[in-house]
Amino acid sequence: TDRSRGLGDVYKRQALRNDLLRRLLRGLQDAFDEKSTSKNEPLKIYADNKESYFQMRCMKTGREGSSQKEGYVILLKNITEFKELDSAKTTFISTISHELKTPISAILMSLQLLEDCRVGSLNEEQKELAQSIQDNSDRLLSITSELLNMTQVESGKLQLKPRITKPIELIEYAIKANRIQAEKFNIQIEVQYPEEKMGKLFVDSEKIAWVLTNLLSNAIRYSAENGRIIIGARQTKDNWIEMFVRDFGKGIDPRYHQSIFEHYFRVPGTKVQGSGLGLSISKDFVEAHGGTLTVDSELGKGSCFTLRLKA
């Protein structure tokens, strides 16, 4: 009736003015939207002068034997304590990572002084020791960088600074960053880039370059000596740009194709050193741009990682 419709409109307007009800309605809409990326995010409610976090679960209700729905039931589980613990963990990791960078930088500066011929030449044993210090310091810097990137993502403070970038510039940066590592194992890096004009990207070039650098570094570490790696880009008919890194190493068991993008996961039996963070951070960075990062791999046939971004 007109009266019931009028009352419904009044209630709807009141609900939209109420912050809590508005958030519940938005959460209800996201819960049944397959394309929504925020359906698993906790619901934040401010009451009694404090913030509380809830996990929201929605269910449709209706008469038995009828396909017609009568309404929804919303269940809220208070996860504030877990959220606070997770936040404390993220803050701790971020603080420790920042604190580690200073002594590592001091070690590297001291190492440069030791290797300066004006101070005095090193014998072969001392050169090996200096190289070991360099390698381990670089590894520590890489780990602290990954931890800082992870805390940015987990705390929701990931800030993108997009600018117009050519895909080839990102590829060249990744190759330059990994050149010494590739030469060390005598690995040839081939570039596949179409001669025809390719679209440009509007992305945070530092973060996407970091992703490509990480993928190329992984490919080198998991390749045999005297091997080869292909890095390149292509544009699809639906105007997406795909950048890929292909190696011809051991490959990844299909059982682990999803797990390798999780924090700290490492394929069982892996002997190559790593933190288990690089791929998960890479995936977060790419998805923050509205893109995807996927893997195509079989045991004994190598791996191909592809990131898709809108041109």
PLM features: what roles do these ranges have?
Residues K127, K161-K166, E183, Q188-G199:
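Conserved catalytic submotifs in the C-terminal HATPase_c
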Residues T1-Y11:
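Single conserved hydrophobic/aromatic residue that forms the stacking wall/gate
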Residues D135-L140:
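Short alpha-helical segment of the dimerization/phosphotransfer core of two-component systems
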Residues V73, I79-V119:
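Primarily the dimerization/phosphotransfer
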Residues K12-E81:
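PAS-family sensory/regulatory modules and their coupling/dimerization elements
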